[in-house]
Amino acid sequence: MKPTFLLAALFLALSATPLFLFADDSQNWAHWRGHQGNAVSLTATPPTQWSESQNVKWKVEIPGRGSGSPVIWENQVFVVSAVPVEGSGRGELSFRLFCFDRKSGDLIWDRTAAQAKPHEGTHKTNGFASASPCTDGERVYAHFGSRGLFCYDLEGKVLWEKTDFPPMTTRAGFGEGSSPTLAGNKILVPWDHEGDSVLYALDKLSGEVIWKTDRDEPTCWATPLVIESNGKSQVVMNGQNYARAYDLETGEELWRCGGQTDRPVASAVTSSGLVFVGSGFRGSFLGAFRPDGKGDIEGTESVVWTTVDDTPDIASPMMSDGRLYFHKGKTGILTCIDAKSGKVLFGPERLPGVSSTYASPIAAGGHVYLTGRSGNITVIRDAPSLEVVSTNSLGEGVDATPAPVGKELFIRGERHLFCLSE
């Protein structure tokens, strides 16, 4: 890897930090990739070894199919699924939100948000419940794409629903999958497809549109990242044409930078005053950007470094302690770089047991968890050199990003939701 450096020292005096999406949620996992969006828990200490019979606190079967990650608030675990409806005709699905007891795995409640036959197909490795839910500790939000966004209280009472989004037409019928993001009084909903693409900011209490911003982008499966930079909240989004940032309050585009590859999926992360955005389908690109620029920042001092080596496709990069971890394309090949300089710390390295990846890496308790589609999860030290700790399996495939909370690790597999604990 040969990063291109552009006045890297200048960014050290600046700061960009994740905007804490919810009040006092560091002991929970309230959003896809956690409360800061960097896929790191600073408090969790989950197990590093398990099997189908070891360190499984409980497991529960989930009907239907979905790859949305579980989210956890105190004693409640939320997960979504698209469940075939028996006797209703071919292709009819029930779009459901499940709430489980964190201690026992018992079902607390199950709500059907919608029942419909999807208007278009999906990729064979995708489904129709790929977006992760999110919660602010008072409400939980389930997003089923073209079927709508649904808001419930924590007892399962529906508070509002928004079902008037225009139907998505995704690239090659690959299906939908971007997750919503909570930030303050807003819930952000990306709507990138082959039609008119839009980023929505909705009132989280009512579902009313606060603002929407047109995006000249084709299908993108990334999830918005909200950061604070120089006193202003920004919404950072990947895109095939440009990586972009928007003013959280108004939706105004603040800056953009080209270089991305086709049909981006990976979401942005942030650390050390920088934002990192990349993609890895039919090409390779990863860039480190200072979020203080204006307009098109390509070729300016706001681009600190870029690389075109071994960058991620489906799985998003993970940021921990100033180190950026990412897989090459959809493979299990791992690279770790110093976020400030772009210098390779180790990799690309082929990991034992992990050959293909959709789930994003996570970090907790001084370890990094790397999930293969086969269900193998390799655990390494969260350190500047590679040290494999273990490789573990639960006997079924995993495409959803795991969620570490407390002393537990929650994993949504093809058929079951698992709670792991020593």
What is each model feature region?
Residues 1-5:
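Positively charged n-region of N-terminal signal peptides that target proteins for export
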Residues 7-18:
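Bacterial N-terminal signal peptides
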Residues 21-422:
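Noncatalytic, solvent-exposed loop/strand surfaces
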